[in-house]
Swiss-Prot record:
This is Diamine oxidase [copper-containing]. It is a peripheral membrane protein. It comes from the Eukaryota. The keyword Ribosomal protein does not apply.
Length: 746
């Protein structure tokens, strides 16, 4: 017997958040997933600074020949220890921090990671290794603020011979420039082989949206030494030609041997001109009345979700979150109806792989964890980034600093109407009326943050529906990465302005989805449709073609690693050994929304840093040594990265009735177009995936929602509207509702 109403009862209890604690993991336990507090960060930093053998100096010291702490973040405990703590009431694991230290003040500089604990009063330290037997190279480290300051002054000094050249061709300079200064954007990887630190810099005019204002000059600088005096400019590229050094370009310019391009003045004086094309200032006609405000989300009685520390309760859902400084947004212990659906769903990496005609354009392969993907989570604007009704949450990062840095309103949490019913039906009587109408309002809960990695803005969402569906979504916006226009560049992009080329690129995002569908013992299977041709049983002289189900069970990791170009089945199921009352394995379906393709050939030079990008989906057995598919260091040493996802698959482990992890790659090709000026817009530039219950419940769990409306026709008078709303209407006044349901000729 299938007691469907039992699920609805459980979820209804969970919707009454005041009683949720009786069936939830206690909120204080969720702190096992929480980011470090400012006090904990300070305690770790103080502990490290006081260890004389480390010889630490402040990060902001203007030298690279120093030892300094680059990153402090929470070190996630082992899963088995956390589950024993959450599910069995065992002692909680030690709370620890991960600390990344740059050791530059020694003969052989290196980067070393440490675990520091226990918090809040640390007294021990132990070395960590991203990959057994692999030592982090000095050249693989991310660039620090101190290094950027040194780079700016080095470029400023090195280009002094070009001062007049800059003034004549751009109207801007590096010297005495006030509001007409030049700046630069650096690209990566930094060289062509492991151990190098040779960066190309795009020289730009520092105006609003300077990413769209290249000057035509790009500079290659070797900055691999800890001694700035050893840094040197190796090459320059200007308007299609290479030069050995600034002096050569200046000399040839002085005698008229350089094919120069004089740029128009973006800041004219005393003239009425439209706003700069890279500006957000409105221009043109838009026929929506400006004296009428747009729609707003309102919740007059307050939120229907509950936030307890880092744990969120909403309808049948509960989950904990953190904002990992190095890689970004993560959610843990995802439960619906009191049962675990996933242990972790997290952003692992975001890359943008470019093509171009200029050296910087062709070199650019951005691997954004190497640029602080999780730490560039700046303030969200009410009414724009999130509804005004959202709960805004702060973040604290220690990334390239000397203490915790407060990022106000770095995340937001809100419920919103979707504008489409979760489900509805009009039951016609086919006589001009109806038997009944029923509908359930569509609402979702959204947890959101953003990452602004220089020019690009990524909007990261985790979305929760009342029918047990969860969605992960990324929207891409911000400025395109652009280079100087040359006719040859049209093979690699689109001309966006007189001297501007928007370069072709592919965005790829990698997620880790640790599925725990009603427990840690899961299996992976797919369902596909096959056509069968058979004799029609009720008309033997005719044939019948119809779809049939074909189920495939996967037993090894290699079988469940789907490469791009290979057909990926539409129904990807993670199943519990438990069966529902109809005899089907209780499952969750992974549904991927993506237009990604393979960009780099397998094994090609820098591709080793992003081998996860070979697979839209790979399913592996859980291993503690396989917690992350990328690292801080893959960007600047992609030729010998410390984390190589392909190695996760080499042991080809059994994946039947095991603790399974789905690694999901989503993305899209972006060929810039004129409408990307000033910014790429979000419509059409979002990708992600859904986790959908598939025979997990005996019926739709959203039946527990009291947002349902049913209308019954009446022979006389008004139709009867059946609603389930709180008895106490003092705090909730429903808007007027009427429904006729008839249809007739006119």
């Amino acid at each position: 017997m299938c007691l469907a109403f039992g699920w609805a009862a459980v979820i209804l209890v969970l919707q009454t958040v005041d009683t949720a604690s009786a069936v939830r993991t206690p909120y204080d336990k969720a702190r096992v997933f929480a980011d470090l507090s400012p006090q904990e960060i300070k305690a770790v930093h103080s502990f490290l600074m006081n260890r004389e053998e480390l010889g630490l100096q402040p990060s902001k010291e203007p030298t690279l020949a120093k030892n300094s702490v680059f990153l402090i973040e929470m070190l996630l405990p082992k899963k088995k220890h956390v589950l024993k703590f959450l599910d069995e009431g065992r002692k909680g694991p030690n709370r620890e921090a991960r600390a990344v230290i740059f050791f530059g003040a020694q003969d052989y500089p290196n980067v070393t990671e440490f675990a520091v604990g226990p918090l809040p009063r640390p007294y021990y330290i132990r070395a960590l290794s991203p990959r057994p037997g692999h030592h982090l190279s000095w050249s693989s480290r991310p660039i620090s603020t101190a290094e950027y300051d040194l780079l700016y002054h080095t470029l400023k000094r090195a280009t002094m011979p070009l001062h007049q050249f800059f003034l004549d061709t751009t109207g801007f300079s590096f010297l005495g420039c006030d509001d007409r200064c030049l700046t630069f954007t650096d690209v990566a990887p930094r060289g062509v082989a492991s151990g190098q630190r040779r960066s190309w810099f795009i020289v730009q005019r520092y105006v609003e949206g300077y990413f769209l204002h290249p000057t035509g000059l790009e500079i290659l600088l070797d900055h691999g030494s800890t001694d700035v005096q050893d840094w040197r400019v190796e090459q320059l590229w200007y308007n299609g030609k290479f030069y050995n050094n600034p002096e050569e370009l200046a000399r040839k310019y002085a005698v008229g041997e350089v094919d120069t391009v004089v740029l128009e003045d973006p800041l004219p004086n005393g003239t009425e001109k439209p706003p700069l094309f890279s500006s957000y200032k409105p221009r043109g006609e838009f026929h929506t009345p400006v004296n009428v405000a747009g729609p707003h989300v309102v919740q007059p009685s307050g939120p229907r979700y509950k936030l307890e520390g880092n744990t969120v309760l909403y309808g049948g859902w509960s989950f904990s979150y953190r904002l990992r400084s190095s890689s970004g947004l993560q959610i843990f212990n995802v439960l619906f109806g009191g049962e675990r659906v996933a242990y972790e769903v997290s952003v692992q990496e975001a890359v943008a792989l470019y093509g171009g005609h200029t050296p910087a354009g062709m070199q650019t392969k951005y691997i954004d964890v190497g640029w602080g993907l999780g730490s560039v989570t700046h303030e969200l604007a009410p009414g724009i980034d999130c509804p005004e009704t959202a709960t805004f949450l702060d973040a604290f990062h220690y990334y390239d600093s000397d203490g915790p840095v407060h990022y106000p309103h770095a995340l937001c949490l809100f419920e919103m109407p979707t504008g489409v019913p979760l489900r509805r039906h009009f039951n016609s009587n086919f006589k001009g009326g109806f038997n009944f109408y029923a509908g359930l309002k569509g609402y979702v809960l959204v947890l959101r943050t953003t990452s602004t990695v220089y020019n690009y803005d990524y909007i990261w969402d985790f979305i929760f529906y009342s029918n047990g569906v969860m969605e992960a979504k990324m929207h891409a916006t911000g400025y395109v990465h652009a280079t100087f226009y040359t006719p040859e560049g049209l093979r690699h992009g689109t001309r966006l302005q007189t001297h501007l080329l928007g370069n072709i690129h592919t965005h790829l995002v990698h997620y880790r989805v640790d599925m725990d569908v009603a427990g840690t013992k899961n299996s992976f299977q797919t369902l596909t449709m096959k056509l069968e041709n058979l004799t029609n049983p009720w008309s033997p002289s005719h044939s019948l073609v119809q779809p049939t189900l074909e189920q495939t069970q996967y037993s090894q990791e290699h079988q469940a690693a789907f490469r791009f170009g290979q057909t990926l089945p539409k129904y990807l199921l993670f199943s519990s050994p438990q069966k529902n009352c109809w005899g089907h394995r209780r499952s969750y379906r992974l549904q991927i929304h993506s237009m990604a393709e393979q960009v780099l050939p397998p094994g090609w030079q820098e591709e080793r840093a992003v081998t996860w990008a070979r697979y839209p989906l790979a399913v592996t057995k859980y291993r503690e040594s396989e917690r992350y598919s990328s690292s801080l260091y893959n960007q600047n040493d992609p030729w010998d990265p410390p984390v190589v996802f392909e190695e996760f698959l080499r042991n080809n482990e059994n994946i039947e009735d095991e603790d399974l992890v789905a690694w999901v790659t989503v993305g899209f090709l972006h060929i810039p177009h004129s409408e990307d000026v000033p910014n790429t817009a979000t419509p059409g530039n979002s990708v992600g995936f859904l986790l959908r219950p598939f025979n997990f419940f005996p019926e739709d769990p959203s039946l527990a929602s009291r947002d349902t409306v049913i209308v019954w026709p009446q022979d006389k008078g008004l139709n009867r509207v059946q609603r389930w709303i709180p008895e106490d209407r003092r705090c909730l006044v429903s808007p007027p509702f009427s429904y006729n349901g008839t249809y007739k000729p006119v």
